[in-house]
């Protein structure tokens, strides 16, 4: 089913992520979570439609704005709902809208300036996209940043990889929970900015129906949620969502890939804002980590 051209009934009016407030970048404060959209295509992608990802994720997020709409807290699994206090979410979550279309150089310059300013202000950028073609631009806005990548193709051996797509280069091994957590703690340098790339391909094949790069194996939803919750407890400067192509056939009006990404992203948001988080989360299953 193609992405609806008109908003769903609950989305009348201005469409923002989880119905968050709109802000100008000059009004971003320390501790804010700042949503920004990248409605662009990867020219090397096998299918067109990645530019629709930012809108699709915003549409889906409306159903997760349970601080305003408690009956729609978790459309994937109602049992996954956590009873936590989210006082202050509306004040700290904001949406800047999308980067405007234009020449590649102008897009990259605008994005780099925006991410750099958000990071300098002590806020965290949530970048909604389908294409990962601008991920290097995001990295360049945060000099000497470390990158943690969930899914996707490994590009740098120095990055921390969770369930990467096989490319014939990375060495992938099975590690127990304690070793995984120890490796993340050893890898993380708190003096450097932290960039998280969250690609839809991190999910197991049966779940990633809207992904242009299907894969064998992968994580279930609970495991991805736990990883993002764990990463969110670090001072992440930016997280970028990639790999989503809403034009591919999916399941239902609010498609499965969109629901998975927003469900998992909520764990990151709550952890980053320190909502109901008293200690580091622990993973309960084995997972693939590239070393």
Regions found by a protein language model. Name each.
Residues 155-160, 249:
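Short, charged/polar "capping" segments at the starts of alpha-helices
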Residues 128-130, 150-151:
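Short His-Asn-centered micro-motif
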Residues 160-167:
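A domain-level signal for caspase-like cysteine endopeptidase catalytic cores
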Residues 144-155:
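Acidic, His- and aromatic-enriched active-site or binding-groove loops in soluble protein domains
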Residues 2-34, 40, 46-48, 52-125, ...:
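Catalytic cores of soluble, metal-dependent hydrolases
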């Amino acid at each position: 089913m193609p992405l609806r051209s008109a908003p769903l009934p609950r989305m009348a009016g201005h469409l923002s992520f989880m119905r968050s407030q709109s802000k100008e970048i000059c009004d971003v404060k320390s501790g804010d979570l700042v949503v920004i959209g990248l409605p662009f295509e990867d020219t090397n992608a096998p299918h067109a439609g990645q530019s629709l990802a930012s809108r699709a994720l915003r549409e889906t997020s409306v159903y997760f704005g349970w601080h305003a709409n408690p009956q729609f807290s978790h459309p994937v699994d109602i049992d996954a709902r956590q009873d936590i206090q989210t006082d202050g979410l509306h004040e700290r979550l904001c949406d800047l809208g999308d980067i405007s279309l234009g020449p590649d150089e102008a897009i990259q310059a605008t994005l780099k300036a925006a991410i750099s300013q958000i990071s300098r202000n002590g806020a965290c950028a949530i970048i909604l996209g389908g294409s990962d073609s601008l991920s290097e631009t995001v990295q360049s806005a945060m000099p000497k940043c470390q990158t943690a990548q969930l899914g996707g193709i490994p590009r740098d051996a120095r990055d921390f990889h969770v369930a990467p797509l096989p490319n014939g280069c990375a060495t992938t091994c099975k590690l127990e929970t304690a070793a995984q957590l120890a490796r993340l703690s050893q890898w993380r340098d708190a003096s450097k900015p932290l960039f998280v790339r969250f690609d839809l391909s991190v999910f197991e094949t049966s779940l990633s129906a809207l992904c242009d790069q299907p894969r064998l194996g992968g994580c279930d939803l609970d495991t991805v949620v736990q990883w993002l919750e764990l990463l969110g407890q670090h001072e992440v400067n930016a997280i970028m969502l990639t790999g989503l192509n809403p034009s591919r056939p999916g399941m239902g009006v609010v498609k499965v890939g969109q629901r998975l990404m927003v469900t998992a992203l909520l764990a990151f948001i709550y952890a980053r804002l320190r909502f109901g988080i008293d200690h580091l989360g622990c993973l309960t299953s084995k997972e693939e980590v590239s070393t």
